[in-house]
Structure formats: structure tokens, C-alpha cells
Amino acid sequence: MKNQWKTSDFDYNLPVELIAQRPLADRSGSRLLYIDRSRRTVSHRQFNGFVEQVKPNDLVVLNDTKVIPARLFGHKQTGGKVECLVERILSKDRFLAHIRASKAPKLGSQIIIADNFKIIIEGRYNDLFECVLHSSASILDLLYQHGRIPLPPYIQREPDKDDQARYQTIFAERAGAVAAPTAGLHFNEETFDALRKKGAAITYVTLHVGAGTFQPVRADSLADHRMHHEWMEVSKAVCDAIAKCRKNNGRVIAVGTTVMRCLETATKNSECRPYAGETDLFIYPGFQFNCVDALLTNFHLPKSTLLMLVCAFGGYELVMEAYQKAVENRYRFFSYGDAMLIS
């Protein structure tokens, strides 16, 4: 194992036409690249092959966060256009946001949204502005009336009605994410029925995915990278389900990198404990996993923290080899793309 990992170690060549721009007609119609760590093999399947790999007493853990229409468009009092991406809701009328304008807004300046809503900028923390909504309505009211789904930057089109349903898991419950937990997008009701028939248990954690998930790693050395913070919750019910799974010799299967980060944040010395709060856990090769036994995930951007996490879990050489095979076999990449299972 290398002592000094570089961001460049996680680069790979991806033809732009392999970046999925739209979802498949069938949620569960995607392909599945399966990595067996014990045999060091890579095989090609359909997504229903995921259920085939699940065993009785396994625990499937998903992220129930709900994507909010977090992109707002407005104007300054001077008339200049402003784009606002809500990163985190702090209260009914207060939130943190990324703001794009011809000139960085000053503290105390106003942004007008659709004539009825006025936002005052009250603070700045690095790239984020603290904003207050001056209205009898809540921030969620504003977003659901005037916001747009914040599609990832690599999807080169404007969102449409189809995205409102498809850039959202069918089990989304807790509003607060600005990006979807994409591994869960493959699940439909038939998937859950099949898992239950296999004798698997299902439970949910919450991690509100922030825009930081799309930010590049700017440090050359991974040791110098600082992760963005995201809010998460692992309940006592989840911890109890994990304990029961262990007692019955089952496996904990994380559906997505967000679930992986939740469970590994909440687990110390192989014991999962309830936790609600911030996580900035950065998982890369050399990390010692305490909770998760298998990972279902999508394909991730070159040099991203998500690819680093997958390499930590699956093994660097094996995962990078699998990515090369995925490119050669024309898999669909990123949020609306195909899936990978590592067990």
C-alpha cells in the first residue's frame, strides 16, 4: 500500500459520450459491474444481479434524503442577474448558498426572487453566503414555487419534468439534498419486493448531499485535502438492525457512498452508535473499514473523492481495472449511469 497517495493516481480516460445525459426508461434496467474482492474478479451483469447477490439475513442500508429544487434565479436591486444554489437550510428563513453574479454580492445586499421574495445576505463563510429570507413563507415554500432541480454540471442540459421524478429515489423522505444519492436511483418497488423475498432486511440513514460532492480535489496530495461538511443521521433503529444482522451472520450492504460515509462515521470499534450531526469523513486507500461489508455504487468522476472511497473499499488496482473494463464495454457513467457492486 502506498504511503503517499496523489490525486493524479485516481485519473482515468473517459469518452464524453459515455456520460449518461438522461435516465433509462426503466429504473432497474441498468447494467451492473460486479467486483468479487475475494476472487479478484470483475464480471458483467444486469442490475437484477444485485438482488441475486443478496443473502438471507443481509441488511441493505439506503439514504432517504430528498433532493430539493435548490437552484434559484433572481436579480439584484441594480438589476444584475443572480443565480443562487441553496447548499443547506439552517432554519425556516435562514440558509447557506453558493451565489453566482457578475460581481460578488456585498453583505447587506438584497436579491429579489420573482418579485415576492427578498433575500438579504448577512454573512460569508469561504465559498458560502449566509442568507435570510424576508417573507412569511419558508425557504422550502420558495424553493418548491420557484426553484429548479440542480442537475450535476456534467449533465449538459436544463432539467425537465422527467428529472423531477427521476433525479429522486422512490424512497426519498427527508428534504435537504442538492444532489441525489445516485446508487438508490436504480431501485423500484420490484427491487424491494425481491429483497424481502430473499430474507434481507432494509433500513435507512440520512445524509443530505451537498454541492461539495461535485467539487474537484485541488490538493496534489490526498493528505492535504479537506472534505466538505454534510449533515447526516444514523438512528438507534439502524444501529439495532446492524447488531441483529451481525448476530445472524449477515452482511451490511451500503447502497451508495453516502451510506458508506454515514455508517463508517457512526461506527467505532465495530460498534454502530446513533449519531446526528456533521460529517467530513474522507475515505481513501488505507482507511480501516469498521461497518460495511458490501457496496453498491455508481461510476464516479476521475480524481473525485467518491472514486477514492471506492478504491479504498474495493482495492485500488482492482477498481481501476474495473473502470477500464467499464469504459471498454461502454457502460453509462455518473448519476444517470450504470451501477457497480463490490463484495
UniProtKB/Swiss-Prot annotation:
Pathway: tRNA modification; tRNA-queuosine biosynthesis. InterPro entries: QueA (IPR003699), QueA_dom1 (IPR042118), QueA_dom2 (IPR042119), QueA_sf (IPR036100). Its main location: cytoplasm. One of its GO terms (biological process) is tRNA wobble guanine modification. GO terms for molecular function: S-adenosylmethionine:tRNA ribosyltransferase-isomerase activity. It is an enzyme of class 2 (transferase). Transmembrane segments: none annotated. Its EC number is 2.4.99.17. It comes from the Bacteria. Gene3D superfamilies: QueA-like. It holds the Pfam family Queuosine_synth. GO terms for cellular component: cytoplasm. Keywords: Cytoplasm, Queuosine biosynthesis, S-adenosyl-L-methionine, Transferase. Monomer. Transfers and isomerizes the ribose moiety from AdoMet to the 7-aminomethyl group of 7-deazaguanine (preQ1-tRNA) to give epoxyqueuosine (oQ-tRNA). Belongs to the QueA family. NCBIfam families: PRK00147.1, queA. This is S-adenosylmethionine:tRNA ribosyltransferase-isomerase. It comes from Coxiella burnetii (strain RSA 331 / Henzerling II).
